[in-house]
């Protein structure tokens, strides 16, 4: 029995690990590598394992950095099932097809200049048909349902509190009369956040593979964060500019809408035009509405009293390209919620092009920004940014609001790890190097756990 560490070992994106036992091979996540172009190009490299030799895929949640290479895996020969939680299965239906559509468009765009330069044309990483082929293999499971997926291999999903359908995965591997329990954290959510439940309590494991996105940081107090959002909205109104909110289509968008509705009167939002300009986020929000049994207690009560749910009276959904382009004619008084969250593509890039050089405009960044992304350059206060090949001076006001992260901070991570009553070996992944190192040191000093930081391709015999 062994674990092989591959994706999200040298950074945050591209989650991907292998478990081997009883002659079977299990793939934990198959995520897209995101960031700078040279990082994204790694997605085209061959997998460090043979896709046709994988017996089953176990997916923690739908975010593309965890699921985004599943169509490529199937395209290259994988034939087995893809297990995940039911809500994640529904979210993947829209996420993977959207990702494939973007890959097709990116290839078309690049091939235009390649053709002019008489360079070889490229193929998209995968197509919508490839995504649909992968989706046919998805098997949805309920939380807390223990399932034998292969001889001697059982799994059980627990709520990770990160996004709808996100999971911690308990995995039991049995071989030659020995059983080892592996717990894969997936992405952990914060405690005491709206809509979703807290991360589940798991008390026993032999090995824990745990994320560390914010393994060296504490998030700002949530109440202070809500106050800050109100101040940003007020400031943007005073400057008579637009307010752009780049947001992940799954999770962050729904939380932003929840707060805008809850504080509609307090933040005087009746003076704004509010646009949800993301077809993916619009469809995802409808899926959120279909899973009220996964909400936390407060959201469940509000959902049962549907007329009392926080809502935005002036919210406008803009699914069509024509509606989206029309927003760019508005120079002030618009709150524009759009994707992608890291500003690596999608409609938000077009809105940035029209607003980033306006002094009265405000850009509120409410999620993690990976190294090399356009969003990270704004967070790092770069004086200019390149959009569609052209440099734009950054004159808009940039606000980084950290308290809304869907990821656990260091205190949340330590709280979750503190639930283990035995002393599992811990393997820290899914973080920048300094975050992984800081978290592993805290685990060793505060919880006296044997914590390591595996590198790409490292193998651990169980």
Question: Where do the model's predicted regions map?
Answer:
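Active-site neighborhood of phospho(di)ester-bond hydrolases with catalytic His/Asp-centered motifs
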Residues: 28-30, 54-63, 70, 82-85, ...
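Metallo-beta-lactamase
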Residues: 99-163, 292-331
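Cap/insert and terminal regions of metallo-dependent hydrolase folds
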Residues: 168, 189-277, 362-367, 384-450
